[in-house]
């Protein structure tokens, strides 16, 4: 069972209660704190589109604490981050692994942050296939295409050479917040809010 805190605010019309995530959304904060799947991607995408409609010139903050997940769901979030007019600032809290790290790097340049004790992990996409040999071959080729696309984008976002990204993502590659800054995944390790 998931518990979601309720925030009560006083207004000129009396009291108003919000779940904590709706209250944070009023301040243009989105929290991605779960596995990335179609459901979480739909929620994040909808919130970004809503915030763009509310004010297309004001930044959106995306807090990430995620073990990663589905590549296609992650690309839905990534593409929306690039599509919306407001800059999307990314902040790693806890862990940004796999697609979570990819989305962390996808934030607006100069606006990608990690808290000091957070961890970042990149690796190649995971997949599996069953069935006839021809179908398995088709799926394997598709995973290689996706791997190359992820590596190319990560190279562009970090400034690292494509070949280095290929080597580093061959296996799980863990980084501290400072190491992620040196790598180019984040721009700054932030100890206190500015």
Swiss-Prot record:
Record-level Gene Ontology MF annotations:
ATP-dependent peptidase activity; ATPase binding; serine-type endopeptidase activity
Q: Does the keyword Secreted apply?
A: no
Q: Where is the active site?
A: 98 (nucleophile), 123
* Enzyme class (EC, first level): hydrolase
GO biological process entries: protein quality control for misfolded or incompletely synthesized proteins
Superkingdom to which the source organism belongs: Bacteria
Q: What is its EC number?
A: 3.4.21.92
**Mind listing the UniProt keywords for this protein, alphabetically?**
Cytoplasm, Hydrolase, Protease, Serine protease
Query: Per the record, what are the reactions this protein catalyses?
Result: Hydrolysis of proteins to small peptides in the presence of ATP and magnesium. alpha-casein is the usual test substrate. In the absence of ATP, only oligopeptides shorter than five residues are hydrolyzed (such as succinyl-Leu-Tyr-|-NHMec, and Leu-Tyr-Leu-|-Tyr-Trp, in which cleavage of the -Tyr-|-Leu- and -Tyr-|-Trp bonds also occurs)
Q: Name one Pfam family in it.
A: CLP_protease
**Localization per record:** Cytoplasm
Gene3D superfamilies associated with the record: 2-enoyl-CoA Hydratase, Chain A, domain 1
Function, as annotated, reads: Cleaves peptides in various proteins in a process that requires ATP hydrolysis. Has a chymotrypsin-like activity. Plays a major role in the degradation of misfolded proteins.
> What NCBIfam families does the database record attribute to this sequence?
clpP, PRK00277.1, PRK12553.1
- What does the subunit comment say? Fourteen ClpP subunits assemble into 2 heptameric rings which stack back to back to give a disk-like structure with a central cavity, resembling the structure of eukaryotic proteasomes.
- Listed name of the protein: ATP-dependent Clp protease proteolytic subunit
- In its UniProt entry, the species of origin is given as Acetivibrio thermocellus (strain ATCC 27405 / DSM 1237 / JCM 9322 / NBRC 103400 / NCIMB 10682 / NRRL B-4536 / VPI 7372)
């Amino acid at each position: 069972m998931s518990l979601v805190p309720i925030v009560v605010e006083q207004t000129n019309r009396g009291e108003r209660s919000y779940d904590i995530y709706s209250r944070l959304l009023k301040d243009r904060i989105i929290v991605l704190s779960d596995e990335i799947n179609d459901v979480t991607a739909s929620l994040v995408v909808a919130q970004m589109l809503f915030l763009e409609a509310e004010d297309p010139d004001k930044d959106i903050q995306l807090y990430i604490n995620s073990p990663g997940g589905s590549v296609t769901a992650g690309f839905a979030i990534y593409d929306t981050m690039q599509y919306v007019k407001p800059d999307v600032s990314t902040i790693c809290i806890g862990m940004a692994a796999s697609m979570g790290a990819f989305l962390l790097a996808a934030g607006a340049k100069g606006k990608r942050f990690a808290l000091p004790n957070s961890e970042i992990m990149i690796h190649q996409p995971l997949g599996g296939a069953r069935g006839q040999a021809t179908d398995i071959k088709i799926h394997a080729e598709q995973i290689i295409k996706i791997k190359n696309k992820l590596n190319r984008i990560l190279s562009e976002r970090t400034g690292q050479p494509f070949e280095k990204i290929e080597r580093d993502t061959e296996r799980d590659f863990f980084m501290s917040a400072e190491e992620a800054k040196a790598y180019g995944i984040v721009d700054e390790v932030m100890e206190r809010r500015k």
